[in-house]
Amino acid sequence: MSNSPEVLIHPSACVDPGCTIGSGTRVWHFSHVMAGASIGRDCTIGQNVFVAAGAKIGNHVKIQNNVSVYDGVELEDEVFCGPSCVFTNVKNPRSEVSRRHEFLATRIRRGASLGANSTVICGADLGRYSLVGAGAVVGGQHPDYALLIGVPARQVGWVSRHGHRLQARDGGGNLLCPESRFRYLENPGGTLTCLDHPEDQPLP
């Protein structure tokens, strides 16, 4: 295990030699981090979380209780995984057929949030700051700031970087976050851009 001395690991957690955990990260009760897993700085790994070899977790990620992050899953910086959300890594699993060579990559991009008990089908690519509602089942590719709900999940609107549904507009027709007052421009082709803060920069 390659760790900074500032890492907090609960005595009941199992952290295998050969994983990497960044400074300021906390690994809580009964969690298991396998050799080959990579976890960034200042993350929270909740109770009963499994992080597989080959899983990649960025900085400032929060993973709530009872989540398994499998090989092939990448969580970029600032991602939030709600309690008991689920990742898959093959589309047609069988106990008697090995499909380890068929694992599909799943990417959850910067700042996205996965609601409690949501399921992410392998191969999904969820855009920055998108939000998946509790209990939704989501697959495929979705844009930044998409609000996704239902089974199967569908996009029903947009959310701001602060997590609010965007409905109000300013005088120029841009969507307006009720908390930050950041403005968002709807682009041709079904994408959204924040006009007041770069998407790849931390909030002030």
Feature roles, as predicted:
Residues 194, 198-204:
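Short, intrinsically disordered terminal segments enriched in charged and Pro/Gly residues
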Residues 160, 177-180:
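Short cysteine-rich clusters marking metal-coordination/redox-active sites
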